[in-house]
């Protein structure tokens, strides 16, 4: 049982902003109804649905008619051109009137008592960016499956989001794991709450990023490096439908088919200092790609007096393996009688353990890079 302290209602009115693009109407309305039905009325100032240029006919007039039942509590904003998830989220947050903004994907279900633990933590620490425990909703049966805070958010050097087990240091720090916030280096990015003023003070989202991808790691690194914290709150649960792929067009301006890559380069150039070299090991094709003006984000980092990325690695995620540091060897494993090297054959690093093959050596290619290090009396090879 979770016992909540009283939260002054006027001090913590929230605005909730589900962003959607051609979402299934029943799934979208499940999200909206669950938030309204399971949130104390004095805490929920508004629900603002941000429609990022949907084309589904049932998200037109039928949606407007359905939302009338909520009166002024629910508003609908429509973009007349495609903004993309990142800029649409920024637009919603700027439109907000509540003290706290809550971002939940449009395919969620808020559980009982989901909001109060998030607000309580923000009330205690204004610079805390807080996430609920994300439960699974089956994309086949729509069944809600309750879970727990069993891991933390991390990242691959290719700048894809990943998760890992809770480290021992964090287990020791938390006296009551059923209640105490879980510090997490990164977040998935679809479900979190933040003080609205703090969100913009620390830089909001990078408006130079297109559509989707990379924004979750960018805000994660930035919050930690600039004095905030990123936390998972065990008492707060929200269900989420994990979908296979994206149901909408992911092509960016100029027919850019790799918005995740170009967004990640913006992140690497501004926030990762010399460690951006490890990103380019995986994405060497992006080295000479123009990703727009970075001057405003660089000035933001200077203005906030943010710490270095090495500080982030040493203090927030010390378990993170740095491939070219503290190892016995780093480079290619080549057959001396030929030009073949050990290679992952383009199997992605974020898919777990992969079987190695051989391929023509690629001096700058991530798939041919091998790390050798000692583990007790044995020698291990890590791709």
Model-flagged regions — what are they?
Residues 80-96:
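Glycine-rich, basic loop-to-helix element that forms the pyrophosphate-binding segment
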Residues 86, 160-193:
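A recurrent flexible, glycine/aromatic-enriched loop bordering the glycosyltransferase active site
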